[in-house]
Amino acid sequence: MGIHSSAENVALENVRQSVTYHPSVWGDYFLTPASNHEESSTSEGEELQESRQEVEKLLGATHDDSLQKLELIDAIQRLGVDHHFQKEIEKSLQDIYLRCCNDKDDYDHNQTDLHTVALRFRLLRQQGYNISSETFNKFTDRNGKFEESLADDVRGMLSLYEAAHCGVQGEKILDEALVFSSSNLKSILAKNHMSNSGLTARIEEAFDTPIRKCLTNFGARKFMSMYEEDESHSEALLKFARLDFNFSQKLHQKEISDLTRWWKELDFKTKLPFARDRMVECYCWTLGIHPEPQYNLARNFLSKVIMLASVIDDIYDVRGTLDELQLFTDAIQRWDISAMEQLPPYMRVCYEALLNVYAEVEELERIDGPYRVHYAKEEMKKLARAYLEESQWLYKKYIPTFKEYMSVAIPSSGYIMVAGNCLVGLGNSLVMKDFDWVSCEPLMVKASAIIARLMDDMAGHGFEKKISAVECYTNENGASEKEAFEELEKQVSNAWKDMNQEFLHPTAVSMTVLTRVLNAARVIHLLYKDGDSYTNSKTYIKELIEAVLIQPVKI
């Protein structure tokens, strides 16, 4: 059972916390778009379309049963332009998978190159095809260990490392593949004997962010440089990727300009100065979840929701007294403008903004179904209840058991709420079944929330003035901080495996829905892999935002 850090019958403290966050690093920078997307869209759009057709011809001319086709598909995906060729890629990978299934023994026998086998495995798993991990058995000895002679195959080692991140629970050979490839790649980097600088960069990038955890639209710019170093790269594809990046960047500049204006008009900087001012970071969060250009409504809505959820989180963590937080939670459960009267002034401005954001999108979503926004509201209500319970623990000085903590901390991570809200604005391809699926908190959604919660807790340990998974685990198990981190990292790894499992056919919902949840987990990896880069946004995230939203690439 949980414990109190002082006397069991300690009186509730009803005071505000004290935390100071640094101001926005962007201010009004994005208020005026750097370029006019509408004016430049016609001529640039024509050039983009012509370039796209060249890549489409290249895809069609490259034989499916070839390493060249696999590498071309991989490059298209890593350059962030795969949404232009979804049908072509799906057809090619489906043909490859069927060939694997229908002629398994002969096909495996003919494929003896580790790079080819590992790349094919990863591409098929990423597409949802449940290709067997036994395909790697041919590279092991009689004891089931990978042949040491493979260590000199640098490209093969890198492909094996990336493939291992597509594993599910119980795939021992992929666990061994990860250890084996990681060890050998680290040795290769330490020796620094490679003449191929592009391959060195790929290894370093893989250790920082494996492809399975990478947001392609954020990693595309860096990959362009690595891809250009590859002697076999396609100039047509590289040109198209650059044109598409710049074209999309102008659209994103317009979107963040609109959001900056909305945020400035709310004037939370003055009215709620205690809250984190992270509008640009919230937009990039959403851009990671919805990279496809057609989802502008979804990006606009979700950006506002995440920004307001961040403010609400700060109200519960650093501003509200316990009595005020109870009133605020009750008001959110009622979801009625009249409930605003019972709130203190600083809560009213946030509450009104929250209701307005949902009311606006509800009007826009009326054609596709008002039930969509209803589901989204319910997830926000759940989030508020979880925030309140955590606040009650803090005021009582109560440290729950790890299991009890996670039962509340998973919903309070905000990621079940994000999963429910990110489906709003995706168009009529989604149906009520998709929203029902999220509301039931399936394994994939829960795994995404576990990744969010535990990575957030590890990143914020020692800084955030609230109970965390680290504290709960050490108190319950008498463990050291190092042991707690090792356990939590193991749970994060297992959560990724659960997400991989849910991504395999047959799936409960469409790949469109599953990809939103997967992308959401990828955002967390980006933001929290080296500390809390959302709260402390003066870090590498600032440079990344500059690269994605400000600086065009040279054609």
Swiss-Prot record:
Keywords: Lyase, Magnesium, Metal-binding. Binds 3 Mg(2+) ions per subunit. Belongs to the terpene synthase family. Sesquiterpene synthase converting farnesyl diphosphate to beta-caryophyllene as the major product. Its cofactor is Mg(2+). The Asp-Asp-Xaa-Xaa-Asp/Glu (DDXXD/E) motif is important for the catalytic activity, presumably through binding to Mg(2+). Mg(2+) 3 binds at residues 456, 464. The keyword Nucleotide-binding does not apply. CDD domains: Terpene_cyclase_plant_C1. InterPro entries: Isoprenoid_synthase_dom_sf (IPR008949), Terpene_cyclase-like_1_C (IPR034741), Terpene_cyclase_plant_C1 (IPR044814), Terpene_synth_N (IPR001906), Terpene_synth_N_sf (IPR036965), Terpene_synthase-like (IPR050148), Terpene_synthase_metal-bd (IPR005630), Terpenoid_cyclase/PrenylTrfase (IPR008930). GO terms for molecular function: magnesium ion binding; sesquiterpene synthase activity. Transmembrane segments: none annotated. PANTHER family: (-)-GERMACRENE D SYNTHASE, OS04G0344100 PROTEIN-RELATED. This is Beta-caryophyllene synthase. Pfam families: Terpene_synth, Terpene_synth_C. A motif (DDXXD motif) lies at residues 313-317. GO terms for biological process: beta-caryophyllene biosynthetic process; diterpenoid biosynthetic process; farnesyl diphosphate catabolic process. Mg(2+) 1 binds at residues 313, 317.
